[in-house]
Amino acid sequence: MRELRFYNTLTRKKENFIPIDATRVRLYVCGPTVYDYAHIGNARPVIVFDILFRLLRHVYGNEHVIYARNITDVDDKINARAAYEYPELALNDAIRQLTQLTYTQFQQDTMALGCLPPTIEPRATDHLEEMRSLIERLLEKGHAYKAENHVLFSVSSIRNDPHYGSFAKRSLDEMRAGARVDVASYKREEMDFVLWKPSAEGEPGWTSPAGIPVLGRPGWHIECSAMSMAKLLAPYGGGLTCDDPTENVFDIHGGGLDLIFPHHENEIAQSCSAFGTERMANLWMHNGFLQVEGKKMSKSLSNFITIRSILESDFFEFNGVLTNEMKQNWAGLSARFSMLQTHYREPLNWTAQRLMQSSSELYRWYELLRCEKTEMEKKNEVIDDSLINALSDDLNTPKALTLLRKFYKRGNAVSLASGMNFFGLLRQEWVRDGKCPLFMRKTSLDEKFIDQRIAERLRLIHNKEWTAADTIRDKLAAEGIVLKDIKDPQTGERTTMWEIKRF
């Protein structure tokens, strides 16, 4: 079995990845809160963990990897946005309208970014029973308490490892100083956090745990503990009915650096306290932060960019015959390519220039594949082992893309295509369709005239009249026509393909 090494946030070092059970490798990633269009910061973990998902499937087999990415559809941000967007509706109706709209948009965005769908996408509102049961387990074990119709996690109740703050590598004093925590009067200690809260009249609410007489809703942190339990533990012998702590650990938990504290710290506290485990997951992976043009992305700085705005932007020319879907898919793959050029743990600086450069380079790759499609059809597309080696070393996508560039420079279309396909950058129909509108920009030159000039150039080359041949090539280039000389696969004779220059 291939050796995989990843940086583990839990231990702050690279480690060999050894799955608990190689026939069911389990990955959980924190997904979106569906109250607004996803922004490009949200796109980064979606793309990063899609690459990890693809690698795990390659190594262990498609049917042996379970990837769960949750959807948070109950949250105070959702309530506030729903009331603002749909003031004419009752709040619960407004919430349903908002969450369905933003969830559907998120699905469309991730598809345009070239991502595979996760194995499972649990929604918080479908797992309220598991949340209540988990909260009641924490109450029974003395790790939670009730106060004014709330249930709170007691941080001081943790006596064994992992102690609270060990994941974030912070002491309680450091966390108190750096955290913006609610110091409500019903808390025993300021770092205690909400597992369940009462709902005001008109707010969404469900039957509360532990006999609390009013309707309520879960806190954010308990949602992920419950959903990961429901999808990655309970189906495989773990969960609340299992007394063996070793059965209540899964393989990989992922998310952004911003989630380390408090969200992931609190998830670990809840899950480990409920199940008596030393770890919630064996490997924790976090992608780095994203900036826009060297600055923190913020609505106040007017540099807040949604995935949707990228997909709908006109950062490069298209001719008028493209469908909206094709435009958006090209923009999505360009954005994906741009992000993969930075290692997932490094900060990523998103710039318009870099997006255009990525789009231009990706276009050239497609041009090679289109020119060599006959040759590609003769050979099986087997992923080059050097690409898998690069990804096996902590998802080193920059190194892997450097290898793809070498394939391009050598004209190795077969290896380039298989690599692009593995990275989610290849749409086969764009290569196979000789008249794909993406590669058919308008020109003022008549096609018959172009073909005549190409024939004349080939004659000059045959006669070794290089200067005259180059003159024809240069004049066509000035009109936006790019020539590519190839050998006819049947006769071995030189022939020339032409495309309208894309950039």
Swiss-Prot record:
Cofactor binding annotation: Binds 1 zinc ion per subunit.
Cofactor(s) the record lists: Zn(2+)
Domain of life: Bacteria
Location within or outside the cell: Cytoplasm
GO cellular component, one term: cytosol
InterPro entries named in the record: Cys-tRNA-ligase (IPR015803), Cys-tRNA/MSH_ligase (IPR024909), Rossmann-like_a/b/a_fold (IPR014729), tRNA-synt_1_cat_dom (IPR032678), tRNAsynth_Ia_anticodon-bd (IPR009080)
Cystine residue pairs: none
GO biological process terms held by the UniProt record: cysteinyl-tRNA aminoacylation
Catalytic activity entry: tRNA(Cys) + L-cysteine + ATP = L-cysteinyl-tRNA(Cys) + AMP + diphosphate
Subunit structure: Monomer.
Protein name: Cysteine--tRNA ligase
